[in-house]
Amino acid sequence: MNEEQRKAGTINILDERDRKVEKDYSKYFENIYQPPSLKEARKRGKQDINYNRDFHIEDKFEGMGKGRTFLIKTYGCQMNAHDTEVMAGILQALGYTATEDINEADVILINTCAIRENAENKVFSEIGNLKHLKKNRPEALIGVCGCMSQEESVVNKILKSYQNVDMIFGTHNIHKLPEILEEAYLSKAMVVEVWSKEGDIIENLPKVREGSTKAWVNIMYGCDKFCTYCIVPFTRGKERSRRPEDIIEEVRGLARDGYKEITLLGQNVNSYGKDIKDLEYGLGDLLEDISKIDIPRVRFTTSHPWDFTDRMIEVIAKGGNIVPHIHLPVQSGNNAVLKIMGRKYTRESYLDLVNRIKKSIPNVALTTDIIVGYPNETEEQFEETLSLYDEVQFEHAYTYLYSQRDGTPAAKMKDNVPEDVKKARLQRLNKKVGHYSEKAMNQYEGKTVTVLCEGSSKKDDTVLAGYTEKNKLVNFKGPREAIGKLVNVEIDETKQYSLNGTFKEFNDAPLVTN
């Protein structure tokens, strides 16, 4: 789009906006938006799930983005990354072209994360930084989407303080993006579309996948666990499983397209299938069916220990393309804290599960998540988390200071753990994480492993980088032709969180190493 076209478009858009009447949001949250309510959320399982396989771009929207560009900034989990791929697919279907220059983008979307306060602060900082851009280019559309958009306090804050935002839409509204954009172009007021109905699963949404080697595949949406610290069941809604035939067809398509690795996604993948009324079919069954598809690696995340079944262990133990890496968040090693967290398992039942996994899958790599400084956590309770870590010997862990989320039950709890104590505990835990990570890495010295090469190293573009089946980062010198392929690499040096090696040969079949 040249400068004259841009100016003409700006005048037309602003004229249209001036003719519109400003919206009255006074009843918005009363009629459409439901703020977090544990009591109300627990009733939602009674709703039916509708499967919509007829998604298409309406004729009236075709060409909407012709001559226009878009940029999406993504915060948060793999689910958000996948949502970004879908939004990019819809935008390209509308005729928009992707750009990496935010100053040139005609549509800017901020895909947000609500899991921790720090993530929200980054988003508000980002939106604030865009005020200058909006002043200079009022025709550009700025949208805030993702999990933060499902929070009443966030929407109110944007409505009050960030008039540079043109549209707010939630996690259940992505398929409505063409309508949202159309209204934003014509509306003088901010477009707010945080759809509270969460019972639909929309298939056949277009996607622009990040790369051609690894792919995300959603198998379910939402979460019904209601851990007391977590906002996700409210922002992502109730558990809804995709039909297995739709998932399997998507995976087959990715295999045909040459993808080497897929990750099955869900807020709690272990609950997969429980809501499908006409079928007795769980994650173990899905994994077994996908193991028959010619794709080298299959991962899944995130797992809740409560739903991890012996059937799943049995399928993973068979080997094949289901990788021997299980991410199993424990959050705490103390029963009292686990109960307050609403995790539905005990230290003993978690360790029993770990022992069953290790017995059936001796070469398994276990990783976890841990929260430090939960409301009223004592030193003795924290010590139990450390001792559990010693007992399991996780190969890696994602560790966090507790972050209060408005609307969750934990937000009402009195927090008497001083900040300096929390940080000191986190430091002690991270020291242990580093110790066991280094111990796991040392096993690889002198061994040959199969690496899925993803591209150049972030630190040195003359070095290639990729991951083993157990998700270990490997940096190595090798031919550029290795990118996107499985290669054998001999490990020369082990570090605390990565491995260095030498390229040996191409390997189209996974090499199983213990």
UniProtKB/Swiss-Prot annotation:
Q: Which residues bind [4Fe-4S] cluster 1?
A: 77, 113, 147
Q: Does the keyword 4Fe-4S apply?
A: yes
- Residues crossing the lipid bilayer are none
Which keywords are on file for this protein? 4Fe-4S, Cytoplasm, Iron, Iron-sulfur, Metal-binding, S-adenosyl-L-methionine, Transferase, tRNA processing
The cofactor note reads: Binds 2 [4Fe-4S] clusters. One cluster is coordinated with 3 cysteines and an exchangeable S-adenosyl-L-methionine.
InterPro entries attached to this UniProt entry: Elp3/MiaA/NifB-like_rSAM, Methylthiotransferase, Methylthiotransferase_CS, Methylthiotransferase_N, Methylthiotransferase_N_sf, MiaB_methiolase, rSAM, rSAM_horseshoe
Q: Which cofactor does it need?
A: [4Fe-4S] cluster
Annotated residues for binding of [4Fe-4S] cluster 2: 223, 227, 230
Single GO MF descriptor = N6-isopentenyladenosine methylthiotransferase activity
Name the PROSITE patterns for this protein.
MTTASE_N, MTTASE_RADICAL, RADICAL_SAM, TRAM
In short, the EC number is 2.8.4.3
SUPFAM superfamilies in the record: Radical SAM enzymes
Q: Which GO terms describe its cellular component?
A: cytosol
EC class? transferase
All copies of the MTTase N-terminal domain together span: 68-186
Specify the superkingdom: Bacteria
Q: Residue ranges of the Radical SAM core domain?
A: 209-439
Q: What does this protein do?
A: Catalyzes the methylthiolation of N6-(dimethylallyl)adenosine (i(6)A), leading to the formation of 2-methylthio-N6-(dimethylallyl)adenosine (ms(2)i(6)A) at position 37 in tRNAs that read codons beginning with uridine.
What does the subunit comment say?
A: Monomer.
Q: Which family does it belong to?
A: Belongs to the methylthiotransferase family. MiaB subfamily.
Q: What is this protein called?
A: tRNA-2-methylthio-N(6)-dimethylallyladenosine synthase
Which species is this UniProt entry from?
Staphylococcus haemolyticus (strain JCSC1435)
**Gene responsible for this protein:** miaB
